[in-house]
């Protein structure tokens, strides 16, 4: 499996850190996807984006010689998760809708891109595509998703001791006293007017 390595992102794109080393999609686990992502800057409409690349190997196949649909859906879910690097909140997948436009053969590289469509209170809406061979190649997969903001304690409760998230100890992040209200607000609302509760 290959991806956008931490040192070889596209020209002008900033490599993004992985979530944690044991992540099935972005960690370095045997049989995992080993995805890496980069920030190319905002799209033409000024919206935050992420990009990446994924080469399908034998552990990722469904039908003989083709990528499993669940593998491609997992890649899209992780791509959307990488968009969180643009935000001051953490989110979990609430809903993921994936469309398959063309088969993805083993050995083929899928070029991934995603954009934030909307942040509305706790809700984050995103969309993305996976294209064959080049970033402008034929569309093989597309997806939309709804993510929901959660406190870091959501992850601390289940994570093994010593787990790091984006390069920092999860236990420290989970006990942060910063208010989520500081980051999650309605359009036009002054975050200083929010009270903890």
What are these regions (language model features)?
Residues 53-55, 97-99, 113-115, 129-131, ...:
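Residue-level recognition of well-ordered beta-strand positions that form the cores
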Residues 78-111, 117:
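Hydrophobic beta-strand-centered segment that forms part of the acyl-chain substrate-binding groove
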Residues 1-7, 11-14, 104-106, 117-197:
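HotDog/MaoC-like acyl-thioester-processing domains
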Residues 14-67, 184-197:
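Catalytic strand-loop segment that frames the active site of acyl-thioester-processing enzymes
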Residues 31-33, 48-50, 92-96, 108-110, ...:
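A generic structural signal for short beta-strands and their flanking turns/coil linkers
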């Amino acid at each position: 499996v290959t991806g956008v390595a931490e040192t070889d992102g596209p020209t002008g794109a900033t490599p993004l850190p992985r979530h944690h080393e044991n992540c099935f999609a972005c960690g370095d686990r045997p049989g995992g996807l080993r995805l890496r992502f980069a920030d190319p800057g905002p799209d033409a409409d000024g919206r935050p984006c992420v990009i990446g690349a994924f080469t399908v190997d034998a552990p990722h196949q469904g039908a003989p010689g083709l990528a499993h649909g669940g593998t491609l859906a997992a890649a899209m879910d992780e791509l959307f998760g990488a968009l969180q690097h643009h935000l001051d909140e953490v989110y979990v997948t609430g809903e993921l809708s994936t469309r398959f436009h063309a088969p993805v053969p083993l050995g083929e590289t899928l070029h991934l891109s995603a954009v934030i469509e909307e942040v509305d209170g706790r809700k984050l809406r995103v969309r993305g595509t996976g294209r064959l061979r080049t970033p402008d190649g034929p569309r093989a997969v597309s997806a939309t998703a709804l993510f929901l903001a959660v406190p870091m304690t959501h992850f601390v409760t289940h994570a093994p001791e010593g787990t790091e998230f984006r390069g920092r100890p999860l236990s420290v992040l989970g006990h942060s006293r910063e208010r989520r209200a500081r980051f999650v607000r309605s359009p036009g609302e002054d975050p200083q007017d929010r009270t903890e509760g």
